[in-house]
Amino acid sequence: MLNVLQKLKIPWNVSNIAQNAASAAICYHPFLEKSRNLIKNENQFLKKSISKIKNFSCYNSSTNFILLNTKIKSKTLQKKLLRKNILIRDCSTFRGLNENYVRIAVKKRKDNLKLIKALEAI
């Protein structure tokens, strides 16, 4: 009987406190609306800014991530940005992509400006 129950158990446990916090966050509409607006506005700002930078182009996204195509190898770009405390995702292992793709996160304006300045300097 115990073996059967263990097979049905989800691979991780979520505490009651975490469940309640998630429920409260989902129900807190002002926060969700503010977050959606921030992501939408900063996403547009990043795409517009990056499109002006040589060697970079970006794909449309309605999420808090943007896929970039770069003429710089993804691992090289990742290392250069890491030196400036900026994390990006190397997408060379993603199916259908190669070493010329990275993913950036849409963040607050201050962080996005830091990323743009770093990309311009490369």
Language model regions located:
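PLP-dependent enzyme catalytic core of the Aspartate aminotransferase-like
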Residues: I72, R83-K84, R95-I122
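Conserved PLP-binding catalytic core of the aspartate aminotransferase-like
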Residues: K40-Q44, I50-N85, V106
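Short beta-strand->loop
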Residues: L87-T93
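Residue-level signal for well-ordered alpha-helical positions
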Residues: K7-L8, K80, A118
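Short secondary-structure capping/turn micro-motifs that flank functional sites
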Residues: A21, N41, L67, L97-N98
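PLP-dependent aminotransferase class I/II
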Residues: M1-K52, F56-C58
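Residue-level "edge-of-site" marker
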Residues: A18, S62-N64, F94
